[in-house]
Amino acid sequence: MDRISNLPDEIICHIGSFLSAREAAFTTVLSKRWHNLFTIVPDLHFDSSVKDGESLTDFVDRVMALPASSRVNKLSLKWWFDEDTDSAQFDEDTEPEDTEPAQFDQINRSLRVVLKRGVADFYLWVHGKQGYTLPFEVFTCETVTKLSLGSGFAIDFLPENALLPALKTLSLYHVRFYEFGRCAFKTLLASSPVLEELTVCGVNWELWKWSRTVSSSSLKRLTIMRKQWDAFDDSDFKSISFDTPSLAYLYYSDYVPKEYLSVNLDSLVETKLYLCPEENYMWGKGDEKRFNPINLLHGLKNVETLNLYTIMTAEMFYVFREALPVFQKLSHLSVNLSNFCWSSMPMLIKKAPNLKTLNIDGPLHYESYYRCAGDIFCECVSEYSFLVSCPLEVLKITEYYGSFRELMQMKHFLEKLSCLELVEVHSQATGERKLKLIADLERLPRASSKCKFEVVS
């Protein structure tokens, strides 16, 4: 007994979390200190995918048996039912079978109890295509700081007294929002006055009924991630606005709407973009008249780190190059242009007068598919004059094979980048082949005497 009593409070609380409510009640008779500590339940977990695990009914009974004075730090409930296998399955990337209405009632009974117990971390994954509705108490909890909701159900409206005064992190997975009188999504953000991080995963904006505005004065990190890239209907995908003046980080993966009506991203420091027009993926002739992403592009003017994940994203910058701002603060640029033309590269370099690090995520580009095989360099980079005034210090290339044509293009980089200090290339070469690759690079003339090479296998 003395050995256990001498343990720190957090260890005793952890031990107590494995006891049933009945067992915990018996142990509290042994010590006043234990009585106080065992009213704290660090975690409540239920996962229907665990084979031979606790049943939903047993979990609900366990929650309902919690003493009125108990406090719950974290709830994690993952549930759906697969009728074909008569067992619960859980996978965030697959579509599950629907949960039965009777099970909805059981789940919500337990949620209401936990929400009254001072819960801080609330994770709920319940598949409810056929009418699941979150209890209103989710949107009036004063203690929750981290809220994660999924998957497949809709949030139609919030209660009039909706307020989450402590919520800092909100994650939404395949959740849809509608509006009945007022926009549920807008109301949720407005009811979270200290929200700092928002993740919207599996988003299909065009299927929502909403204000088409992401608005939060406190938000610092925003992740928007589309999962489904087929069967896209843009008939009701006209515009999106961002009013997030404190946002420092943006990850944005989606189709481009027809227009960004209003964009406030003045505090943005780091941006990662994966954007494409409609289902054809590539920008084509006439798209500059059908789309207007200019407000978004101007909203990026203060970024310091910019990652353009795809050729489609880089091409958007090229198509609207006349309207691009100068990115005075941009010091780190990553681009993935695959084997396509680098037409956007000279323009991006010129628009970033203080660029220090360029990461080419992929191979060097030395010829176009539309030119004869004898041409080493594509017209888009043939002169390389855009490099002369670039203050680049670090050049990284994630796919390098050491071919003659790659060496010739590398020669152009090295001869014109007078501030270059490090060239880092990633190669699968090993042994003597790697030594030859390094030796070939070392023989190239350099405008910068400080330039060193690093080959990463």
Curated annotation (Swiss-Prot):
An individual GO BP term: anther dehiscence
Keywords for this protein: Leucine-rich repeat, Repeat
Domain F-box: 1-49
Keyword Repeat: yes
Domain of life of the native organism: Eukaryota
CDD domains found in the cross-reference section: F-box_AtFBL13-like
Pfam families per record: F-box (PF00646), LRR_At5g56370 (PF24758)
Sequence ranges of the LRR repeats: 53-79, 147-174, 177-202, 229-254, 283-310, 337-362
PANTHER family assigned to the protein according to its UniProt record, in alphabetical order: RNI-LIKE SUPERFAMILY PROTEIN
Protein's name in the database: F-box/LRR-repeat protein At3g62440
Species whose genome carries this gene: Arabidopsis thaliana (Mouse-ear cress)
